[in-house]
């Protein structure tokens, strides 16, 4: 009988040890799992950051996957030229080329009959001619006065390549493509011995109520704000400046009780577009009190401080900021490497794994 108890005890001890080991493994896996929440107003570059994670950490886009973006790229291109043509009338700008009026009529006719995402050689020629009209170019220069995709010039300047027979989108074409994010999109990848779960949440106002489900157990928030949006208004409310909306949103997230212990990283994105714009449009259009030099560095630092000054718990909570260009893979790779080091330092120093 004694040996029976002994073997039962051994079995019990073995099971107990196995359970302990499993609990330890689960704890280690959980400690190595990083839940990243990407937040920010609409069109701030969140989805482009997600695409970069696929390029940098998940073997990029296959030819087949790139081909799936072709219709989106053509749709973005058509929407851009239609938006500029519409703004010509609103802003009272005339065409210079005599043929452009006829091209405009044909453009509208074809846009109404073609399937979304189609691009015929005839349509491509019409778009090319219109884009070459000095009146259209003058209207494009005033893009902040109406809603236009950031990718407009990228695609319209490269129509010959985009509409050539056998065209296969490259990664830059994919990165510049725009589809409004609705709901929550999760991307998983591994980096520096950590398992990342990145959640991209729709930025337009109507999408924000869905964020609440993502709050629990978030390791780090990356907040994207478009530097170049300082002279632009919201798609969903043309009375509201995009930069002001972004600051308002950042304020509510940065000081939210849910995120008291969450690392927050600020991506001041679209620095390339900001650099172009700041040479032409003074920052005082957004911040009337700003009287400093209208340079990339001075104006950029001023915007950065507008965000950082919203942090009400500076002594307890540091907000890390980076100027980014989400379409620049090397820039995102460098910045995300730094973000990962912050996560390791802030969140894993107490678990004894590093």
UniProtKB/Swiss-Prot annotation:
Molecular-function GO terms, alphabetical: G-protein beta/gamma-subunit complex binding; GTP binding; GTPase activity; metal ion binding
Disruption phenotype: Mice are not affected in their tasting ability for salty (NaCl) and sour (HCl) stimuli, which are known not to be mediated by G proteins; but, they exhibit a significant reduction in the ability to taste the bitter compounds denatonium and quinine as well as the sweet compounds sucrose and SC45647, a guanidine sweetener. The incidence of cells responding to bitter stimulus is also reduced by seventy per cent. The residual behavioral response to bitter and sweet taste in these deficient mice suggests that there is alternative mechanism to compensate.
Keyword Metal-binding: yes
Disulfide bonds: none
GO BP field: adenylate cyclase-modulating G protein-coupled receptor signaling pathway; G protein-coupled receptor signaling pathway; response to nicotine; sensory perception of bitter taste; sensory perception of sweet taste; sensory perception of taste; sensory perception of umami taste
Keywords: Cytoplasm, GTP-binding, Lipoprotein, Magnesium, Metal-binding, Myristate, Nucleotide-binding, Transducer
Residue span of region G5 motif: 324-329
Region (G4 motif) residue spans: 265-272
Binding site for Mg(2+): 47, 181
Record note on modification: Potential N-myristoylation may anchor alpha-subunit to the inner surface of plasma membrane.
Amino-acid positions noted as binding GTP in the UniProt annotation, renumbered to this chain: 40-47, 175-181, 200-204, 269-272, 326
Domain of life: Eukaryota
Entry-linked Pfam families: G-alpha (PF00503)
Bias kind Basic and acidic residues: ranges: 8-26
Region (G2 motif): 173-181
UniProt subcellular location: Cytoplasm
Function: Guanine nucleotide-binding protein (G protein) alpha subunit playing a prominent role in bitter and sweet taste transduction as well as in umami (monosodium glutamate, monopotassium glutamate, and inosine monophosphate) taste transduction. Transduction by this alpha subunit involves coupling of specific cell-surface receptors with a cGMP-phosphodiesterase; Activation of phosphodiesterase lowers intracellular levels of cAMP and cGMP which may open a cyclic nucleotide-suppressible cation channel leading to influx of calcium, ultimately leading to release of neurotransmitter.
Family designation: Belongs to the G-alpha family. G(i/o/t/z) subfamily.
Protein's UniProt name: Guanine nucleotide-binding protein G(t) subunit alpha-3
Taxonomy of the source species: Eukaryota, Metazoa, Chordata, Craniata, Vertebrata
Name of the encoding gene: Gnat3
């Amino acid at each position: 009988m004694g040996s029976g108890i002994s073997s039962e005890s051994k079995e019990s001890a073995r099971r107990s040890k196995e359970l302990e080991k499993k609990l330890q493994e689960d704890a280690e896996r959980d400690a190595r799992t990083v839940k990243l929440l990407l937040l920010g107003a609409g069109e701030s570059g969140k989805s482009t950051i997600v695409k970069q994670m696929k390029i940098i950490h998940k073997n990029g886009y296959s030819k087949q996957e790139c081909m799936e973006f072709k219709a989106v790229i053509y749709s973005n291109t058509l929407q851009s030229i239609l938006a500029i043509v519409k703004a010509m009338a609103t802003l009272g700008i005339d065409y210079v080329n005599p043929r452009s009026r006829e091209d405009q009529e044909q453009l509208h006719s074809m846009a109404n009959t073609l399937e979304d995402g189609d691009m015929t050689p005839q349509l491509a020629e019409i778009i090319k001619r219109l884009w070459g009209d000095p009146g259209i170019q003058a209207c494009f220069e005033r893009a902040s006065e109406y809603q236009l995709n950031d990718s407009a010039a990228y695609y319209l300047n490269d129509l010959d390549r985009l509409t050539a027979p056998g065209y296969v989108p490259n990664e830059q074409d994919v990165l510049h493509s725009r589809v409004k994010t609705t709901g929550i999109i999760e991307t998983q990848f591994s980096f520096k011995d950590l398992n990342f779960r990145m959640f991209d949440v729709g930025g337009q106002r109507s999408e924000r109520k869905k964020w609440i489900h993502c709050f629990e157990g978030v390791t780090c928030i990356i907040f994207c704000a478009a530097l170049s949006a300082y002279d632009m208004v919201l798609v969903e409310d043309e009375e509201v400046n995009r930069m002001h909306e972004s600051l308002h949103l950042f304020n509510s997230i940065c000081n939210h009780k849910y995120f008291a212990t969450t690392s927050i990283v600020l991506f001041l994105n679209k620095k390339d577009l900001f650099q172009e714009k700041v040479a032409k449009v003074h920052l005082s259009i957004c911040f009337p009190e700003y009287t400093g030099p209208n340079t990339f560095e001075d104006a950029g630092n001023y915007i950065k401080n507008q965000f950082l000054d919203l942090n009400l718990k500076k002594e307890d909570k540091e907000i890390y900021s980076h100027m980014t260009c989400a379409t620049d893979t090397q820039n995102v790779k460098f910045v995300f490497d730094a973000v990962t080091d912050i996560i390791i330092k802030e969140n894993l120093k107490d678990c004894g794994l590093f």
